[in-house]
Amino acid sequence: MTLRGLFALAAPQSVGGQAVIEGVMMRAKDKLAIAVRKSDGEIVTEVRPWFSLVVHPWLKKPFLRGFPVLMETMVNGIKALNFSAVQAAEDDEDDTELTSWHLILTMVLALAAALGLFVVLPHFLSVGMEFLGLGGDVDSLSFHIWDGVIKMAVFVGYILAISYIPDIRRVFEYHGAEHKVIWTWEEGKELSPESTRFYSRLHPRCGTAFMLFVLVVSITLFAILVPYLLTFYSPENFIVKHLYIVGMKLFLMIPVSNIAYEMIKFAGKHSKSLFCKIMSWPGMMMQVLTTKEPDDSQIEVAIAALQCAVNAEEC
């Protein structure tokens, strides 16, 4: 799954998107469009306003905007996924979209799962390495090296595991279609399967790259700040100490996401520079796992989503 709406520039021609179930969501400025292929082959489209949390000027400042933009992208993404699930279902008469409370619960569960997998689990596995004599205490470099290695292993392992699920593979194919269509749009070419299929399924502003930046920034920031902050206060009880550190790490994910957002904005804006190409390369390689080659029917859906996003009044 991508968060390109997170990284779209302010220019009118900038677009972003995400793959959904049997479809694609695209964002252009303050509108989003969802296109879904129904079981009978029909492409259903819907245009909606982009829900934004960045309503105050100070939330638009660099190194403050990343976290609220991430949250609003999650809200819009979950809504788009729910719409696509309803439309793609064989029998959608009994299916309804999420209520506000269901949306909040879904977001809380999604955040809890992500933080559990990529913050809490690596921390306590690193504690296990200390018990096995393979690493040091939390204020040592070896602890944070293990923490980083485990985070990366969990991330790659998770992507590899879900890629074997047929429905997820279909989402990855639509992810590839989304990237190809955005490349075609950015190059000013005709939006058709024939002109689009030859473009790369990898894109430097992909949400996969953002997730990788989050991991790298969190590893670096935790290694520096956690030992330093423990000099001010460190609980004596072993369990309380590590629960305190995990809580500290969870709070630090806010500045981590802010920094990662600025990094990917910079990389996207200067994508032709050698430095940014090197910086973006790991994220591009991860997209080999999170995207698959789409067929023409999937490209058609991505084109429909983009056309509705940029010409909302015609859909």
Which residues fall in each region the model found?
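Divalent-cation
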Residues: 1-85, 89
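Polar-ligand-bearing catalytic/cofactor-coordination segments
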Residues: 4-16, 20, 24-26, 40, ...
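Low-complexity, intrinsically disordered, cysteine-poor segments enriched in small/polar
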Residues: 66-73, 77-80, 84, 184, ...
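Alpha-helical transmembrane segments of polytopic integral membrane proteins
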Residues: 77-80, 84, 118-122, 126, ...
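Juxtamembrane "helix exit" motif at the C-terminal ends of alpha-helical transmembrane segments
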Residues: 83-87, 111-136, 214-245
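Hydrophobic alpha-helical segments characteristic of transmembrane helices
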Residues: 87-133, 139-164
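Transmembrane alpha-helical segments and their cytosolic interface motifs
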Residues: 100-116, 199-224
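Alpha-helical transmembrane segments
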Residues: 241-264
